[in-house]
């Protein structure tokens, strides 16, 4: 730990002044190499030199500088035999503590990379792992080389018999780009791994990576709450009233408009973590004080919560915006319980025929508006044939 602190202090001492880009360009190669060997990410290097611009730009500048300096990771095989015998496996990881790759790269665009779901909590990971494994099986069946990037040892997708190459490494932009530049694949599948791969889609697309299936722009239009809400308004689909708020006064004003209960969600959380239904003022204040730091940097999404509504899910696959297969399932609990924790029955047992018909129609409209090609999930609130979209 003293070495890490020493490297960071050295970077800061040398580069706590001047133009951001010049700071990165003047970073000594030996110091940068030492930082990478000790585990500093490009983000941490940019932060250590005091980069003041958009941090995503800072990461790209650091990346460009180290690539020009020849500071690149190498690929090593994980020794599954503890050095008892020479091990030849496709179980791989990247490191800066090496001089040559353990595997040979063809660079023939004949591989397809699947991004896994990473470390997920109990109740919301098995479906992503199943999707990833099915994608790997299909890739092989179609005659392509299958490549998986994931770091959860408890999943089937990280069994190195499942694919031609398994990178047991982190699902960050930096590491994924390092692997993609080595593999030079035909394309990348982000749609089977859940939130973490989806968050990388736009940044990978900006680097001219071929995203297979639904485009990065369409993924962003579904993931970005404001863009998705505007799209629903444009196609005439109902949704619960909501706002992204940055102060207690704004939250109080919105609650007075819609009344209790309200659903409160801090920004940038995975799998519905830290969501809470607040039924009165005391619960709202306690939750915001304990679980959410409300500010312009950390806005909170507050939604109208409809009591005694049923939550219904549409899981489907579309091609060029047209649904080709679907399944509608029904939550036994009332809305407000996360899908990963809820008890779900399929086929649905207690839905009105009109409710099912409307859900199908709305799903077709959303798939067409987003031009979806691949799997997707839409969550609905249903009460007395009144259908509202929660998210896609």
Where do the language-model regions lie?
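Single conserved hydrophobic/aromatic residue that forms the stacking wall/gate
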Residues: 1-13
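N-terminal beta-alpha lobe that positions the nucleotide/phosphoryl donor
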Residues: 17-34, 40-60, 68-378, 382-392
């Amino acid at each position: 730990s003293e070495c890490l602190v020493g490297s960071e202090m050295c970077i800061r001492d040398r580069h706590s002044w001047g133009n951001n880009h010049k700071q990165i360009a003047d970073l000594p190669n030996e110091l940068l190499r030492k930082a990478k060997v000790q585990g500093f990410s490009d983000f941490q290097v940019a932060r250590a030199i005091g980069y003041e611009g958009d941090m995503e730009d800072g990461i790209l500048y650091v990346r460009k500088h180290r690539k020009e300096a020849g500071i690149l990771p190498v690929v090593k095989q994980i020794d599954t035999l503890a050095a008892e015998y020479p091990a030849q496996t496709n179980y791989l990881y990247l490191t800066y503590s090496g001089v040559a790759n353990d595997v040979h790269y063809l660079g023939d665009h004949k591989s397809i990379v699947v991004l896994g779901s990473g470390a997920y909590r109990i109740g919301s990971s098995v479906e992503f792992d199943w999707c990833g494994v099915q994608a790997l099986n299909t890739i092989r069946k179609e005659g392509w080389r299958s490549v998986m990037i994931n770091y959860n040892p408890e999943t089937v997708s990280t069994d190195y018999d499942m694919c031609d190459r398994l990178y047991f490494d982190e699902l960050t932009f930096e590491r994924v780009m390092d692997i993609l530049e080595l593999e030079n694949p035909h394309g990348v599948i982000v749609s089977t791994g859940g939130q973490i791969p989806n968050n990388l889609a736009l940044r990978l697309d900006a680097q001219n990576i071929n995203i297979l299936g639904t485009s990065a722009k369409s993924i962003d239009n579904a993931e970005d709450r404001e863009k998705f809400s505007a799209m629903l308004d444009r196609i005439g689909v109902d949704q619960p009233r909501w706002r992204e708020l940055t102060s207690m006064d704004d939250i109080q004003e919105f609650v007075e408009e819609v009344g209790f209960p309200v659903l409160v969600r801090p920004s940038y959380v995975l799998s519905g973590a830290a969501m809470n239904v607040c039924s009165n003022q005391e619960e709202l204040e306690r939750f915001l004080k304990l679980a959410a730091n409300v500010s312009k940097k950390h806005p909170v999404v507050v939604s109208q919560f409809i009591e005694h509504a049923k939550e219904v899910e549409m899981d489907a696959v579309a091609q060029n915006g047209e649904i080709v297969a679907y399944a509608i399932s029904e939550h036994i609990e009332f809305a407000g319980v996360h899908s990963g924790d809820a008890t779900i029955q399929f086929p649905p047992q207690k839905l009105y025929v009109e409710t099912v018909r409307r859900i199908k129609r709305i799903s077709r409209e959303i798939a067409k508006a987003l031009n979806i090609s691949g799997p997707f999930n839409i969550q609905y609130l249903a009460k007395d044939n009144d259908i509202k979209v929660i998210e896609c």
